[in-house]
Amino acid sequence: AGCDHSQGIYIYXXGQGNGV
């Protein structure tokens, strides 16, 4: 599943970030 929204994009990997 994806979770990195640091750049406002749903990235597959998972991570931390505050974006859209």
From Swiss-Prot:
The keyword Transmembrane helix does not apply. Pathway: Amino-sugar metabolism; N-acetylneuraminate metabolism. It comes from Rattus norvegicus (Rat). This is Putative N-acylneuraminate cytidylyltransferase. Inhibited by CMP-N-acylneuraminate. Keywords: Magnesium, Nucleotidyltransferase, Nucleus, Transferase. Homodimer. Mg(2+). Other divalent cations are less effective. Thiol residues may be essential for catalytic activity. One of its GO terms (cellular component) is nucleus. GO terms for biological process: N-acetylneuraminate metabolic process. Its cofactor is Mg(2+). GO terms for molecular function: N-acylneuraminate cytidylyltransferase activity.
